[in-house]
Amino acid sequence: MAERGTIIEGKYEVLKLIGKGGMSKVYLAMDKNLNKQWAIKEIERKAYDKNNEVVVASAMAEANMMKKLDYPSLPRIVDIIEKENVIYVVMDYIEGETLSSVLSKEGAQPQEVVIEWAKELCRVLDYLHTQNPPIIYRDMKPANIML
């Protein structure tokens, strides 16, 4: 597990943990060469866990597919770093709050705002569905939508 101050691949300095899921952790990091912030997803390899092999293979397939995408509302993947015990996926850092967080703090939102969010989500899904082959996003939920 990376900690604050850890340098990844000689250039990405971990600033803080910004997210945690079932299969990964996400850190905010600074590229020391470009003076730019990135989000770095850390996926741990667990040699003793057969299920982890599936998780790692799935995460790598997802990262390799996503690095080919180019759409303003989707984070770009700019680097994939494979180490013996861990994989780091370096992607755009998107500032803001999740839809889940906004709804928890503020409750229901004005109809006009929700319609704009829905339109943008539809545009993103349309972009994904028009890829060859089509990409089906199966993890659409408020916690995965940044505003």
Predicted regions: what is each one?
Residues 28, 36-45:
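Glycine-rich ATP phosphate-binding loop
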Residues 123-135:
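Protein kinase catalytic-loop region centered on the HRD/HxD motif
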Residues 80:
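Activation-segment/catalytic-loop signature of the eukaryotic protein kinase fold
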Residues 19, 61, 70-73:
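Flexible N-lobe loop architecture of eukaryotic-like protein kinase catalytic domains
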Residues 84-98, 102:
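Conserved short submotifs of the Hanks-type protein kinase catalytic core
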Residues 15-21, 26:
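Protein kinase glycine-rich loop
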Residues 44-68:
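AlphaC helix of the eukaryotic protein kinase fold
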Residues 117-118:
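Activation segment signature within eukaryotic-like protein kinase domains
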